């Protein structure tokens, strides 16, 4: 369309200038409206074709999902000794890996679509060590530590699952063993009541519930001797199978409680596993009740105490009443820690009025300077010779001093020196290094 602007003198003689302006604007509107209408007409078939193609793609995907699910349901599980990526006939009784992967992807899509569907999370922890001492007859050795597979699953807002499975080699036989150190259903009613049902770490003191089976989380190379695991010579019931309840009593005071009941542990002199996972050796149950305070006024401070009671049945001997009283005062921040714990075990045979007291304590201090954290710990345990359960431990005490270097947030290198002094034995000097990591 072409517009010709006439000489302005003509407008002055016959046509008003306002009329011409209005004509020009009307022509422009007609021109652009025609172009827009043409574009809409051209795009309409394209949009319709796009929508149709998308709908067809959705139908195809739904059909594929239904086909894959029907195939998986129709086939048997894959035998453990026949893992192949090549699809085989259904009559062979194996599921092709490609089909299993497709089913896994379908489940993943469902999990993404449904936020309430349980989700399994896996973390791993491990450590490698080198240790040496001047004890006669002992060799220096590199040693694999614990491989810790830590599983959690949130089922809903209140219910979750936790499993901590450790793969570890025996020091004597060098053979690997697998043990679920913690296996728990967790039910959170509120801040005032949280339940753990299954195999848990007993709430005796601070260290046992603050540090579990991960070396990278601990400042030093190992746990204090007082809190060593049962199968490593420890004298405390570190694990228990039963029910544990924890919760907040007073938010203003920062007061919390711990209440536990379980099978307890068997006598260490028994040939059975110290942790009574399936069968209790007697009808009595172990009880533990504790309280601790975390005052808001002093961030990082915690102090508390607990009392534990059980009956232990050693082979060929009378039942033994066991009481354990523990107290702790801890100050811990990201850069500084000062851990102090004391425990007294009391053993009283049922056929005697004599009570044997076993005192023990440790104190650990460390401070972080950049990526470096030097630390020092002194520990002490004294088991009298007349104790019916742990007389072989006797008196052991001594210092540990070391340096931890943070490679990053998930890995650390440690070097440590120690000196163990035992009753009726000479002192033993120790040196060790450790590389610990999380993945």
Predicted regions and their residues:
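Outer-membrane beta-barrel pore domains
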Residues: 135-136, 184-188, 196-199, 214-217, ...
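Outer membrane beta-barrel
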Residues: 107-267, 283-288, 292-299, 364-375, ...
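Active-site-proximal beta-alpha loop/turn segments in soluble metabolic enzymes
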Residues: 260-278, 310-314
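N-terminal periplasmic/intermembrane-space "pro-region" immediately following the signal or transit peptide
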Residues: 36-130, 439
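N-terminal secretory signal peptides that target proteins for export/translocation
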Residues: 1-19
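Hydrophobic alpha-helical segments of integral membrane proteins
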Residues: 31-32, 185
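Bacterial N-terminal signal peptides
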Residues: 21-31
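Interfacial loop-to-helix transition and helix-capping segments at the boundaries
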Residues: 276-284, 320-322
